[in-house]
Amino acid sequence: KQPQTVEPRSTDIFTYPLVHMTGHGNVFFSEEDAQNLRKYLISGGFLHIDDNYGMRPYIEKELKKVFPNQELQELPADHPIFSSAYNFPEGLPKIHEHDGERPQAFGITYENRLILLFTFESDLGDGWENAEVHNDPQQVREKALKMGANIVKYAFEN
């Protein structure tokens, strides 16, 4: 089955408990997108944004439309999302090298619930693609898949 897509402004977003977003650069949320996405997230939805490279400046700017009074906060390595199914004692694993920077996980919380996860300098999605696409070793792909399982489990349980 093909992955489903949904627009941030669509009411269909409320049928998905978890939404995954990825890309390489320019992201823009209209006011309608931002309002609907905020409503989705504070109503129980979860958004994982995986920076495939180049999204961070756009995401930081556009998330200000969604949550004008909140900043992305770096998650500590002992955050439960790193141990919900598989243990990552160092936090977010590094999957794909772009420029040698350390992987970072950022979040936005609402009423003590992590509602948005932004993974940066990790590129989990590369490890989720077919092995032939990036020629990643099996252990790298397994780390990506296990971290993905952690994200899904955490999102469904919190």
List each language-model region with its residue ranges.
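An acidic, glycine-rich "communication" segment
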Residues: 56-130, 140-149
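Short alpha-beta junction capping motif
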Residues: 18-57
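Surface-exposed patches in mature extracellular/periplasmic domains of secreted proteins
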Residues: 1-7, 49-52, 70-78
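Aromatic-Pro/Gly-enriched surface loop or interdomain linker
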Residues: 1-18, 22-25, 115, 123-124, ...
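Sec/Tat-exported extracytoplasmic proteins
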Residues: 23, 45, 63-71, 155
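Alpha-helical scaffolding within the catalytic cores
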Residues: 2-8, 30-35, 100-104
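Extracellular/periplasmic catalytic domains that process cell-envelope and extracellular macromolecules
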Residues: 11-15, 41-42, 107-112
